[in-house]
Structure formats: structure tokens, C-alpha cells
Amino acid sequence: MKCKLSDICSFRKGKISVDGLNRSTYISTENMLPNKCGITEASSLPTVQLTQEYKKGDVLVSNIRPYFKKIWKATYDGGCSNDVLVFAANSNTDKDFLYYILANDDFFAWCSMPIYCRKP
């Protein structure tokens, strides 16, 4: 059975105040570890007032250099940079299943292809 990614998840669009974050709850591409190894503590917080929100169970994927395979399933709520995509599972989708799909090497290979080579 084939389906579109939009059938199982959507991008989270909410914003969160940076004042409510700390270096443990802020995620950027810099503190996401390559090869699907999770995250480390951020070295600093952004200087803007609001940033992208994520919720526990969301899947965060670095939007920069996808061949590094930076991905993390959130274990708590927080905020992230705009260079991090936040995928929220739809109500009919298991959050672990969404992580499994997005952490698959085929997904990262597809993301690494030039846009004109991608099949819908």
C-alpha cells in the first residue's frame, strides 16, 4: 500500500517564546547529531523572540545537508530553529511508526536528490 507523507503527518506550524526555552529544550542543526544519533545540548539560544515549536513525540529532521541523517524523536516539548523540520503524526498514525519511516535511509536518500530528480 502506498500513501503520501501528508497522509500520515503534517508540519507543525506553531511558535514558542524563546524566553520559555533553555539550552536543553532548544534544537538547531548544530546540536543535532549525525547518523541518527539524537541531540546534544545547544551552545546558545537564538536572539529572536519566537521560534518554531515542537511537541513531545514530534520528529525533528535537519533541513540542511540531509546526507548527515540528523533526526530526533522529541522526548519533551520545546523550540527549534527554522532549519529543522518538525513532523507531527496525524491522529491515525503511531508516532514511533512516523519516526521509523523518516529515519529510513531511503527517506534521507530521497531528500538528498536534486529536486528535479525526485518522484512525487
List where the protein language model places each region:
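Extended, charge-rich, solvent-exposed interface segments
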Residues: P120
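Short, basic/aromatic beta-hairpin or loop at an interaction surface
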Residues: Y26-T40
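Short coil/turn segments at secondary-structure boundaries
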Residues: V18-Y26, M113-I115
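Non-catalytic DNA-recognition/assembly elements of restriction-modification systems
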Residues: M1-V18, M32
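A short beta-sheet element
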Residues: L50-Q52, K56-F108, Y116
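Residue-level detector of conserved, well-ordered beta-strand and adjacent loop positions
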Residues: S6, S28, A88
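Short alpha-helix capping/helix-loop boundary micro-motifs
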Residues: I39-Q49, K70
